[in-house]
Swiss-Prot record:
Record region (Disordered): 248-299, 1572-1622
Topology versus the membrane: Multi-pass membrane protein
Stored Pfam families: Ycf1 (PF05758)
Name of the molecule in the record: Protein TIC 214
Biased segments, Acidic residues type: 256-268
Miscellaneous comment in the UniProt entry for this protein: There is a partial copy of the N-terminus (positions 1-489) of ycf1 in the inverted repeat (CAC88092).
Gene, per the UniProt record: TIC214
Major localisation: plastid
Compartments reported by the entry: Plastid, Chloroplast inner membrane
Protein family according to the UniProt entry: Belongs to the TIC214 family.
Function: Involved in protein precursor import into chloroplasts. May be part of an intermediate translocation complex acting as a protein-conducting channel at the inner envelope.
Record keywords: Chloroplast, Membrane, Plastid, Plastid inner membrane, Protein transport, Transmembrane, Transmembrane helix, Transport
């Protein structure tokens, strides 16, 4: 088995070796190059298909393979590469050859020479085939879009050592691929032929000879293909003669003649010219290759000077005065006849832009008279054909405001050269060009023997050995220091040895630290430059000529120096390379450079010695002679610039180009039209006197130009590809997938989701129906609005399309303009007057008064205004400039509308008023056909017709006549009906009267008495008779009527029937009514005693009967009366009793209601009074803490009687407030492992997840902490928490609620008297009233407060015993032992925003506990949504900050109540006031939460600035300033207004209401403020257990800023005195100054406002030209064209007024802060700094670090991953790396990594995270001493953060590598991860 595994391992290793070998890689890459198909394949394919005979086929393949072999060889062999790979050959040879081929061989049968008997090799056709394939293989062009495959070999060649082997294997690989390809091609051809010959019958007759035709037309097909490639390459490689020649910058062309003869001519001979031209001729696919400055194929030392000069502003007039030459007399290895001359040009003239006056130009010149006639013929030819400065390719011309010419894009940011890396010679792509240049110069001047190459193995071994030695030394030193620290000795052995530069070994004199190049950090000062501009200005030119300046390059040659500065200590760890050493060493000898030459001539031994040494450095023989002065040349990479100063078309139109630039534009801008809308001084011809106001309007079509330069080829552009025949918009190919998604993979997600939700929809059908009913009208409304929007957008699109069409057609504008003018003339002077005449004549015909005056008045009112193409009004008479070319619009104001009559204007009707409102914006644009359109090119609108009101009026009159007619008809009908009815009634009365008379007669005839009821019968019978009679009579009448009518009516039969039916119905209805009334009468019996009846008995009986009836009823009543009275009394009593009962209840209810009203009234009155008081005091004391928690009065104590109000959080909170109680009693609750009845289990789990339980509360055994557990822990540290902005993007709802709850103001919720009455709290009302996103419910608020108190209280009780030295509970700023919450001292980035709001931060407010301000410079996040900042609102907004420190009896502090923002409309934006309130400074004041009052006033919709309370009060001062530009203001300015050092007595002397202006105080205040600002950030020193703070002496922290501030204040004072008239108040001037000085911002206006402004401008243009503009201005205001609110009528408007009006909104520009370079470096590299108290022995160096603050404003570095602890414990030494300096620390890690074999530190560190290896710490931890309680957590945290996740090391590995400096670019990191530290 072992043997088998051994064999298997060998096989695997062998396979790996084979795969990684050069041969296999070459074969692979060569095989890939087969697929880069070029035109040579076309020739080969044609030879195989068409040529007869094997000789031609063989010759074709032979030529093809030979050409490819030559190409492979040319990769390695430089001369062949130069011959074949240069664009000269391609342009000169390839294109003519292609054209020749096309025209010569454009025949059906070509190469048909017939059979010859000669030798086949001598046959011309075979040779031609061979040559064709060979030459086409050499041509470097490809058909496929990417030429990457063909260049793979070239790319891999860089990495390969054995290049010849690689090239040959690559060629073999290509040959294999080619053979396979040819075989496959042959098989295809054979298959086609066989297919044609075997199955001819299957083809239809027309297609029978298709393949034969194809073979015959092959020649033509190939020639067409070749022609296409020829045209393609003609487009890609333009003809040099035909392209447009741009005019070069005139100043660049003007050179001194002698210089011109010898400056750039050398470029033509050098290879650099070739490489530059190669960029021009290279293919489109790779337009930005990266050539090295020095290619490998034979280096020419002259090339390095062959870049073009950069002249700033073209000022080189005084150049000749600085000319100086240094002739070199002889060298051993350089031919003296061709020795170059150094020409130095001192470019002091560019100091206005570059800022570096010693940036000298160095050029290589030839001798004056040599080679003068050599290149005279070459220059015009070469520059004509191959001028690399010409814009043949579509490069972008990227301008820079500081320089004139644009940078050439072909220059790579990478620089390739060989360097030592990991002990091997490798090609580095980030090699510093200066070093390369330097090394080439040294090579040219040193003998060849000294430059012998060492073998790579030797170098590797040497590197490994030195690295081992260095790492061993480091480890030894490190372990020695650990042992010393372990012994706790305070000897100097702990100190790290520093290598210093010494002047003299014997005396041990060192160079001052300021100039010591071997020291770094705060020891170093600024290095003074050679010259300052003031010296240059003061000294004359002659002195400058005579000045001797040391050239830094020459100091590298120091063979026999008399100065021994470079003698160093034996320890070579900090030894730097020579180049950087000399760069720093020259600061020593700058003093010699600053003296004129005359002083050097004095016989001073030292100085002559020095000059001797300098020139001995160049040649040991000392044969040099100084002819003229030498200028300093900073070796730097020259940037090639274009020699043209190009301007865009837009710049030409606007006239924004400088002098010396050609007037014609070279860059094509987007298609735009410059429309002049107003010109002053029209009469004068002088263009300088004329002032034009112009608008630039862009066309709506896509921009196909994209800043292309004239003469460059559009086809070569990569990012604007046109792939369709007609393409509307131009797109980059990169985004094509976004524009047109593929159809195959596109599917509707909603269709997939529907079946999933079908079941749910079935279950909840009812709800769906209800929702549908509710949502249906909404949907319909939405549909309607969408339809309207769609139609509107369609119309707009159509309008734009019409406009573009008119613009694109040739001569369209001329035709359109002339048509419009004719239409306007026709309308105004012909059409409308003729209509007016016709109308009035018609009125006269109809006998009406004519309306000549009214119509003519309206006709005169109509104005035809000439407008620009975009509708900007000019005037009636003035035409726009170039209107025939650019187009014109005619706008009709008050268009005339012909009316048939005019209504009197005295009393207009309501309808007329409504019409007027609609016609407010009554204007239109004239169309080509004389119609009216609302917008230019819009659809014509319908005009109101003339005849419509006439027809309406006629209809009205007709209607009135109809009404009158119908009314008369009605009256007549009614009268006839009444007559009929009267006649009927009279008839009835007559009949009745007759009957009655008959009855009387009968009765009189009778003597007998007639009984009553009998008479009734008779009457009934009579009635029946009556009915019969009436029926008969009716019938008779009807018959008679019908007879009479039937004579007159033509269709009498039908009408008769109808009439009969009607009469029958009416009669029957009448009879029925009469019968019913009579029956009712019969029901009540009548007592009819006739007068004739004389029977008295009857009378008596009737009366008796009546009496009896009455008596019966009376007895019943008397019988029931007793019960009735009884019941009545009972009811009465009950009602009385109920009313008596209800009276007090009603009264109490009324009383309660009245009292409630009174209370409410009283409260509101109090609030009003309170507001009045606040207004007087300028303090919005809207809500206060009436009583503190510990001072609850007896009156309020009844609130807490109910135990339900008590919660655990409240109990714990009360206990925490009492300072006497011992919280250790509650430790059992937290230590109890099972569930506890008192403390909720959630809290315990919460702390377990936090990882902050003490070792007592958990297992004694250390857990193995992996990354997941540490993630949980780190989430609770704010520096690892995301900002609110990021969280709100991730989880919008949950996190936003949480953040809003944590960020809400705490001023009211802390009062626990209202623990359960949050709903009534004003804060919530305020939040509801606010127009903000912070919707937080009262219950969530309540829960959050509870949660917070739970966490806080349990946290306190857990860490109670160990509070003195606990890790988490003790802050870096802790001065008091009552502070509980941990906060990291690294306050950069997001901490101010991520901090939970409800922190106990009163202990942060002390004098010394100000954060190190410089660290906050990198904050860039700013949550605008939370802060609600808007300058558009006005109002009186102040904030009152209550700060109550938890001070000790021995400390005295002054407390300031800061007023944040004053009234904006009165005082300006940033007016700060300070209220001194000495009452709050009580010695024994208890702990009060940090409280922010105010900001609750509602102004319009929302307050200007919603102050959140996470900021420290120190920063609150200038927070309103800081919020606009938090990354530009120096953060130290935030501390300028602090008065925390004032005593109470001083506070008492200051009036409470005294306001101190922040920006323009008196001089005394300035000095006080600056003095206050000088106070350094307190280092937090405090003895353990002491209650007295150590006072820190103020140091010069802000020396730099002090000067700036004094300047600012002085400037503002002078500005104030100068500009008193311009500003209404001081604050406006202050604000102006402040914004200019400290802030960089852009003023933005809304889009809506922008549109309104443009409309206003259009109206202004018209009004300026009118003689009497009042009429038009009033009408335009009425129509809404001109908005008065944004009209700026005042002369001088300040910024504040503009912002108040809402016109301008301040928007910050995000810029990077220009930080101090040292500060960035130490912020990036510097790990933590151990506190002073631990390194008292290190004072010699450390004190220097604290005191030297001249350049480094304060050199104390705040820690990034650890805390500063004020006690003398050794926490920071748990991480051993903290002993070393940062540079040595990184060096130690990297060197230990190079030597390590096992890498296991990627996920976790085995030593520091394993329980078993904990004892390995004994080297630096004393096991005898007990660990502190929290030391385990600390160790885990630090060892987790140390080795695995040190990001600053990985990011800056390349930038700040130890012992070298290789530029600022990040290269590929070769360090994966450094392993654990080995302790032997």
């Amino acid at each position: 088995m072992i043997f088998q595994s051994f064999l298997l391992g060998n096989l695997v290793s062998l396979c790996m070796k084979i795969i990684n070998s050069v041969v296999v890689v070459g074969l692979y890459y060569g095989f890939l190059t087969t697929f880069s198909i070029g035109p040579s394949y076309l020739f080969l394919l044609r030879a195989l298909v068409m040529e007869e005979g094997t000789e031609k086929k063989v010759s074709a393949t032979a030529g093809f393979i030979t050409g490819q072999l030559m190409m492979f060889i040319s990769i390695y062999y430089a001369p062949l590469h130069l011959a074949l790979g240069r664009p000269h050959t391609i342009t000169v040879l390839a294109l003519p050859y292609l054209l020749f081929h096309f025209f010569w061989n454009n025949h059906k049968h070509f190469f048909d020479y017939g059979s010859t008997t000669r030798n086949s090799m001598r046959n011309l056709s075979i040779q031609c085939v061979f040559l064709n394939n060979l030459i086409f293989q050499l041509f470097n062009h490809f058909i496929l879009p990417s030429s990457m495959l063909a260049r793979l070999v070239n790319i891999y060649l860089f990495r390969c050592n054995n290049k010849i082997l690689f090239v040959t294997s690559g060629f073999v690989g290509w040959l294999i691929g080619h053979i396979l390809f040819m075989k496959w091609l042959g098989l295809v051809l054979v298959w086609i032929r066989q297919n044609h010959s075997i199955r001819p019958n299957k083809y239809i007759r027309s297609n029978k000879y298709l393949v034969l035709e194809l073979r015959n037309s092959m020649a033509r097909i190939f020639s067409i293909l070749l022609f296409i490639t020829c045209v393609y390459y003609l487009g890609r490689i333009p003809s040099p003669i035909l392209t447009k020649k741009l005019k070069e910058a005139s100043k660049t062309e003007e050179r001194v003649e002698s210089e011109e003869e010898r400056d750039v001519e050398i470029e033509t001979a050098s290879e650099m010219k070739g490489t530059k031209q190669e960029q021009e001729g290279s293919t489109e696919e790779d337009p930005y290759p990266s050539p090295s400055l020095f290619s490998e194929e034979g280096w020419d030392p002259d090339k390095i000077y062959e870049t073009e000069e950069i002249r700033v502003n073209g000022k080189d007039k005084i150049k000749d005065k600085f000319h100086s030459q240094l002739t070199e007399t002889g060298y051993n290895n350089i031919n003296t006849s061709n020795s170059p001359i150094y020409y130095y040009e001192d470019s002091y003239l560019n100091n206005n832009n570059t800022g570096n006056p010693e940036n000298f130009k160095l050029q290589l010149l030839d001798k004056k008279n040599e080679n003068k006639d050599l290149f005279w013929f070459q220059k015009p030819l070469v520059s004509l054909l191959f001028n690399y400065n010409r814009w043949n390719r579509p490069f972008r011309y990227i301008k820079n405001n500081r320089f004139e010419q644009a940078v050439r894009t072909e220059m790579s940011q990478y620089f390739f050269d060989t360097c030592k890396s990991d002990g091997k010679q490798r090609i580095s792509f980030t090699y510093p060009p200066s070093l390369s240049t330097f090394w080439k110069m040294i090579k040219g001047r040193l003998p060849l023997l000294s430059l012998q190459k060492t073998l790579p193995n030797e170098l590797d071994n040497q590197w490994v050995s030195t690295n081992k030695e260095k790492s061993n030394n480091l480890n030894k030193e490190f372990l020695n220091r650990l042992e010393v620290l372990d012994k706790e000795s305070l000897s100097l052995d702990i100190l790290e040895t520093r290598t210093r530069l010494s002047n003299d070994d014997t005396k041990k004199e060192y160079v001052p630290k300021m100039y010591d190049p071997l020291l770094n950090g705060p020891y170093r000062g600024t290095i003074k430059k050679g010259f300052s501009p003031s010296i240059i200005n003061n000294t004359s030119i002659e002195n400058l000529k005579e000045r001797v300046i040391l050239n830094r390059i020459h100091t590298i040659f120091l063979p026999n120096t008399d100065y021994q500065e470079f003698e160093q200590k034996v320890d070579t760890v900090d030894k730097k390379p020579l180049s950087t050493e000399i760069d720093e060493f020259l600061t020593l000898i700058n003093e010699f450079g600053n003296e004129p030459k005359s002083s050097l001539k004095v016989n001073s031994e030292k100085k002559t010695k020095f000059v001797k040494f300098l020139f001995n450095a160049i040649d040991p023989n000392g044969t040099k002679s100084v002819k003229k002065s030498i200028g300093i040349k900073e070796i730097s990479k020259k940037i090639p610039r274009w020699s043209h100063k190009l301007i865009t078309e837009l710049e030409q139109q606007l006239g924004e180009f400088k002098e010396g630039v050609s007037l014609d534009h070279q860059i094509r801008s987007r298609k735009a039209r410059r429309v002049v809308i107003f010109t002053t001084n029209m009469d004068s011809d002088d263009p300088e006197v004329k002032e034009e106001v112009a608008l630039i309007s862009y066309s709506q079509q896509s921009d196909f130009r994209r800043g292309i330069i004239k003469g460059s080829m559009r086809a070569q552009r990569r990012k604007t590809v046109i792939w369709k025949l007609f393409q509307a918009n131009v797109h980059s190919p990169f985004f094509l997938d976004r524009i047109t998604p593929p159809r195959l993979f596109s599917f509707d997600i909603s269709e997939l989701i529907k079946p999933i939700f079908r079941n749910w929809a079935g279950k909840e059908g009812e709800f769906e129906i209800i929702e549908f009913r509710e949502e249906q009208p909404k949907r319909e409304e939405k549909k309607e609005t969408d339809k309207k929007g769609e139609t509107k957008s369609k119309k707009e699109k159509a309008r734009i399309a019409i406009a573009e069409a008119w613009d694109s057609i040739l001569f369209a504008q001329i035709i359109r303009g002339s048509m419009l003018i004719t239409q306007s003339i026709l309308r105004k002077y012909i059409l409308l007057p003729s209509l007016i005449i016709a109308k009035n004549l018609g009125r006269m015909l109809f006998l009406q008064l004519p309306e000549w005056s009214e119509d003519l008045e309206e006709w005169n009112r109509e104005m035809h205004i000439k407008c620009t193409y975009n509708g900007v009004q000019l005037s009636e008479t003035e035409f726009p400039k170039n209107w025939l070319r650019d187009g014109i619009q005619i706008k009709i104001l008050f268009p005339f509308c012909l009316k048939p009559w005019h209504i009197s204007k005295l009393y207009p009707s309501h309808e007329e008023l409504m019409k007027k409102k609609k016609q407010k914006d009554d204007f239109c644009f004239l169309t080509v056909w004389g119609m009216e359109a609302e917008l230019p090119f819009g659809s014509p609108r319908s005009r109101p017709s003339f005849f419509e009101p006439i027809f309406k009026e006629l209809e009205k009159k007709n209607g009135k006549l109809k009404k009158k007619y119908f009314i008369t008809l009605k009256v007549l009908k009614g009268k006839t009906k009444l007559f009929r009815r009267i006649s009927k009634e009279t008839k009835k009365w007559l009949i009745k009267s007759i009957l009655f008379l008959k009855k009387i007669r009968k009765e009189l005839s009778k003597i007998k008495l007639i009984v009553l009821f009998r008479f009734k019968e008779i009457s009934e019978s009579n009635e029946t008779k009556k009915e019969k009679d009436s029926l008969i009579s009716n019938q008779i009448i009807n018959e008679s009527f019908s007879q009479i009518e039937s004579v007159n009516w033509p269709n009498s039969s039908l009408i008769e029937t109808k009439m009969k039916d009607l009469t029958d119905r009416t009669s029957t209805i009448k009879n029925q009514i009469e019968r019913i009334t009579k029956e009712k009468k019969k029901v009540t019996p009548e007592i009819d005693i006739s007068r004739n009846k004389t029977n008295n008995i009857k009378k008596f009986e009737s009366t008796k009967n009546i009496f009896q009836i009455l008596q019966r009823r009376n007895t019943r009543l008397i019988w029931k009366f007793h019960y009735f009275i009884k019941l009545f009394i009972q009811r009465l009593y009950i009602n009385l009793f109920l009313s008596i009962i209800n009276i007090p209840r009603i009264n109490t209810q009324l009383f309660l209601e009245s009292t409630n009203k009174l209370i409410d009234k009283y409260i509101s009155n109090n609030e009003i009074n309170q507001e009045k008081i606040n207004n007087k005091k300028k303090i919005h004391f809207i809500s206060t803490l009436k009583k503190s928690l510990y001072n609850i009065s007896n009156k309020n104590s009844h609130i807490f009687f109910d135990l339900s109000y008590l919660s655990q959080a409240y109990v714990f909170y009360k206990l925490s407030q009492t300072q006497v109680i011992n919280l250790s009693k509650f430790r059992s609750v937290l230590q109890y492992n099972r569930t506890s009845f008192f403390l909720k289990t959630k809290i315990k789990d919460y702390f377990r997840t936090l990882g902050i339980f003490h070792s007592e509360l958990k297992h004694k055994k250390l857990q193995s902490y992996r990354i997941n557990q540490w993630k949980n822990w780190l989430r609770r540290h704010y520096q690892y928490d995301l900002s609110q902005i990021r969280w709100s993007r991730l989880m919008p709802q949950k996190w936003r609620n949480r953040v809003n709850q944590s960020c809400m103001a705490q001023n009211k919720n802390i009062n626990l008297n209202k623990w359960n009455s949050y709903e009534n709290d004003q804060l919530i009302h305020y939040k509801k009233e606010n127009d903000s996103e912070l919707y937080s419910l009262s219950n969530q608020e309540d829960n959050f407060q509870k949660c917070y108190r739970y966490d806080l209280l349990s946290y306190k009780s857990i860490n109670y015993k160990n509070k003195s030295d606990s890790f988490i509970s003790r802050l870096p700023f802790q001065v008091n032992k009552n502070l509980e919450i941990s906060y990291n001292s690294n306050t950069s980035k997001h901490n101010f925003f991520d901090m939970p709001g409800n922190l106990y931060i009163n202990n942060y407010l002390r004098k010394g506990n100000i954060l190190y301000i410089e660290r906050n410079l990198d904050r860039k996040y700013f949550d605008w949504k939370i802060i609600h900042f808007s300058l558009r609102q006005k109002g009186d907004i102040e904030a009152w900050v209550k700060i109550d420190t938890n001070s000790n009896p021995n400390t005295k502090f002054g407390i300031n109540n800061y007023q944040i923002i004053e009234k904006i409309d009165k005082k300006g934006l940033f007016y700060l006031t300070i209220h001194q309130n000495p009452e709050n400074t009580q010695k024994n004041s208890k702990k009060v939460f940090f409280d922010w009052m105010g900001m609750n006033e509602k102004i319009f919709n929302r307050p200007i600035f919603n102050l959140e309370f996470w900021f420290f009060p120190e920063f609150v001062l200038l927070y309103n300033v800081y919020k606009i530009k938090p990354w530009i203001i120096p953060s130290k300015l935030l501390l300028l207004n602090l008065n925390t050092n004032e005593n109470v007595s001083q506070n008492k002397n200051i009036n409470k209401n005294q306001k101190q202006n922040f920006f323009l105080p008196s001089n005394k205040k300035i000095k006080n403020r600056i003095q206050e600002a000088k106070e350094p950030a307190n280092q937090g020193e405090r003895e353990r257990g002491s209650d007295i703070e150590n006072k820190v002496n103020p140091g010069p922290v802000l020396s730099k800023h002090q000067n700036d501030l004094e300047k600012d204040y002085a400037e503002s004072d002078t500005k104030k005195s100068k500009k008193k008239k311009q500003y209404k108040s001081n604050t406006e001037a202050e604000l102006d100054l402040f914004l200019k000085r400290y802030l960089l911002f852009q003023l933005k206006w809304n889009d809506d406002l922008n549109q309104r402004m443009i409309e206003n401008i259009k109206v202004y243009c018209l009004l300026l030209r009118l003689i009497n503009p009042t009429k038009i201005s009033i009408s335009s205001v009425q129509r809404g064209e001109m908005s008065l609110d944004i009209m700026l009528i005042q002369g001088n408007l300040t910024l504040t007024e503009l912002m108040k009006k809402g016109i301008l909104i301040i928007e910050p520009i995000r810029l990077s802060v220009k930080n101090n370079g040292q500060f960035i470096m130490y912020q990036t590299i510097g790990i933590s700094l151990v506190h002073k108290s631990k390194h008292q022995t290190n004072q010699r160096y450390r004190d220097q670090r604290y005191v030297d603050k001249k350049n480094f404003d304060e050199s104390i570095l705040q820690p990034q991953t650890q805390r500063i602890n004020t006690d003398k414990n050794h926490f920071d030494l748990l991480v051993p790396e903290n002993i070393l300096w940062s540079r040595r620390r990184r060096e130690l890690r990297i060197r230990s990594f190079f030597n390590s074999l096992n890498w296991n530190g990627v996920d976790r560190n085995s030593v520091f995270c394993n329980e078993t290896n904990v004892k390995n710490w004994s080297q630096f931890l004393d096991e005898r001493k007990p660990l502190y309680k929290e030391k385990n957590e600390l160790i885990k945290l630090k060892f987790f953060l140390w080795p695995n996740y040190r990001l600053e090391d990985l990011a800056c590995m390349n930038r700040y590598w130890f012992d070298n400096n290789n530029g600022s670019r990040f290269s590929i990191l070769r360090i994966h991860m450094y392993p654990r530290l080995k302790i032997n």
